[in-house]
Structures are given as C-alpha cells and as structure tokens.
Amino acid sequence: MMNNKPAKIFKLIPALDVLELANVEHIARIVGNNEMFYGFKAGFSLGLTHGLGKVVETIRRYSDLPIIYDHQKAATDIPDTGRLFAQTLRRAGINEAILFPQAGPVTLEAWISALREEELKVIVGGLMTHKAYMHSEGGFLNDQAIETIYRTAVDLGVNSFVVPLTKPEAVDRIFQTVPFRPETEFYSPGYGRQGGDPSRFASIARHYLIVGRALLEAADPVAWIADASTQLRSAS
C-alpha cells in the first residue's frame, strides 16, 4: 500500500472514441487548456480513419495538453514490434501511450524500452472495466497474472497505470500487493456512463478520470464540465 500520499488531485481526460474529426475539434475547442483536464485520449477509430498525425494536428489547434494513444490494446504482439509502434507515435506527435502487455514480460520490457527511446510517457494497464475479464469473474485472464503485470511494470520503473473505476474491490487487492509509489499517477476509465465512483479509491492521490460518452454526447458539454469540475474539486 502507498503511504504518505500527496494531496488528492483529480483531472479529466476525454476518450475520443469517435470517427469524425469534427467531434474531436468540438471537444478540443471546449476543453482547450482547462486546468481540470489532464489531456486527451485517442484510439484506433480516429487513428485508422484519419491517421494519428491529423488527429494530433486537430487537437493542437486548441490545446497544448498531452495526447495519449490507446491502441486497445497495445503490447499484445512480439517484442520486436515495440520499436515500430513507438516510432509511429513519435512521428505523429503523440505524447503518451497505454500498454496492456498480455503478450508477456519480454514484450512488456521491450515495448517500455522502445517508448522511452522515443521519449514517450509509458502507461501500463492490466485490469479492464467490463465483466468476464478476470478468470474469477468468468474471463480468460488469470487474476494473479494481472497483478503480476502491475508489479513487473513497477519493477521496470513505470509510474503511470490504468485501473478501472468499475472494479474498486479488484483494484484494492492489487494495491495491497503491488508496491506503487506515493507519486504514482492512475488513469481510470469508467467515469460517467459506466458509473464508476472515484470516491471509492482513497489510496489514489493523483487520479485522472477518463470520460467518454457522458461528455461527448452531453447536450451541453460546457455545463457538464462545470458540474463535474465542481464535484471533483469538492472531493479533492
């Protein structure tokens, strides 16, 4: 468990899981450099439709915040492809990348090294938001293996991780066994429509909440941001 934590910090990250650059531009214009936001998360839908460079260019018209690429899921290939992945992201102007290293520890180490060579921030995840993911809930992946992903990444010097808001008990068990540092950053999907409650994660000091449809489909995104900001500031 982490001790002597710094003050609680909440930030928001829009998950840009859309097809049209017009939607990206709309959200980027509204968010800008708002202090309640950490950055933007883009995935395969935008990357495969338009190319990541075009996505980055669109966001950069309105914001200097970090742009995170979530390949959904990266690091599930052989170790050697990590270098090509990292170079592709760097050329596009991406700042950070999320890895879910289900291909094993050799791939994890190689992909971390490749991202660092390209000066990209590394974020590692092992647990996902949906049901029937872990073996204990009817999924394919051994619970212990998921825990080992986090521990191995910590041993490799990673200090930024993905944990889902929708599974507080499972995250708690990971926190009890993995030696996360007090300054570790946690990126959490599940805020908004999936019903995740950040107040259930008292052990996390630096918490970046990933929000998708609740913001992207809001009738009034500006009002949604104002309401969310008020709630998160009161919880800090």
PLM features: what roles do these ranges have?
Residues M1-I68, T76, L141, T152-D155, ...:
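Conserved N-terminal beta1-alpha1 strand-loop-helix module at the mouth
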Residues V18-E20, F44-L48, K73-A75, P101-A103, ...:
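Active-site-proximal loop/turn and secondary-structure-junction residues that shape catalytic pockets
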Residues T76-E169, P182-E183:
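Conserved anion-binding
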Residues N23, G51, L84-F85, T107, ...:
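Short acidic active-site motifs
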Residues L52-H71, L115-L127, I174-Y191:
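Alpha-helix-loop-beta-strand connector modules within alpha/beta enzyme cores
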Residues A92-G104, Y191-G196, A205-W224:
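Glycine-rich phosphate-binding active-site loops on the catalytic face of alpha/beta enzymes
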Residues L165-L215:
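A C-terminal functional module that forms or caps the active site or interfaces directly
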Residues F10-L16, Y38-A42, I67-H71, A97-L99, ...:
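Hydrophobic faces of well-ordered beta-strands that scaffold small-molecule active sites
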